[in-house]
Amino acid sequence: AQMSTQTGIDGVLIGAYSALNGVFGSRFEGPNHWVTGSVTGGEANKGTDPGDYSTINPIQRYENDPAAGDLNNLWRGRYEGVSRANKVLALLAGDASSGIQASIKTVMEGEAKMLRAHFYFDLVKHFKNIPVFDETVSAADVSTTKNTSDAAAWTLIESDLNFAYSNLPETQSQLGRVNKWAAASLLAKAYLYQQKYSEANTLFDAIIANGKTPAGAKYALLDNFAGIFNAENDNHAEAVFDVESSMNTGSTQNANYFDDLNYPYNTGQDGPGICCGFFQPSFQMA
């Protein structure tokens, strides 16, 4: 019965948002992807002690076993996010949403599609020929869905983001919910990854000229670069897509997931992350 109310379906949507920061407790599910991005890209090294989190080492050397746990957890976590977004969309398309105002349903659909596109974008960046399924695919067919290219993924990503860009509001009453300009920015990035430079340029021009944060602030550069990382500046004018977290819950260290290892080594009990000196700049970058 709860699933047939706006509050119930919104709770499922919030569950999809929660997958942004990981589901299965693996640090590789964190949204930063500094290992698969900066470390494999050459501008950073793992850092810390040689034996600490040694499963990162083969990833840096491009020797990772496809069956290794870290990347498998990234795969599982992102598909869990897809599944949660699909559940929202299935509920909105069914009888359960009949009592919800049409305009509210459209916004909820836009948020769910933006999230689904984000999860698929992460998957297509990390893996090849990923299976793609939307809210119409039955659970029985999910395990047999296959693909021989990334074309289907990009098609769905573009479709979802175009819908979100066209239907999401510029501002949101609850910070943390995505707005139309977050969708536009991710869509422009998707165009870049596909070498659709003309489409990306047109969209970036619109974002620069008109883009706003969900709080309504026009996109702008902060006066101090360090201010981007100051918690007191959450949802600042450079924040296009923020992943919100609770605080003072005692559930983890004082940092974004996986970034909590990257503070200076042995900063002590009162330090920002207690340890560990990961994610150090490489000589190549310097």
What kind of region is each of these model predictions?
Residues 1-52, 130, 162-165, 177-182, ...:
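An aromatic- and glycine-enriched ligand-binding surface/loop that stacks and positions planar moieties
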Residues 105, 129-150:
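Short coil/linker segments at helix-helix boundaries
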Residues 122, 126-129, 135, 193:
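Alpha-solenoid helical repeat scaffolds
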Residues 6, 10-14, 18-24, 48-127, ...:
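Conserved, well-structured interaction surfaces
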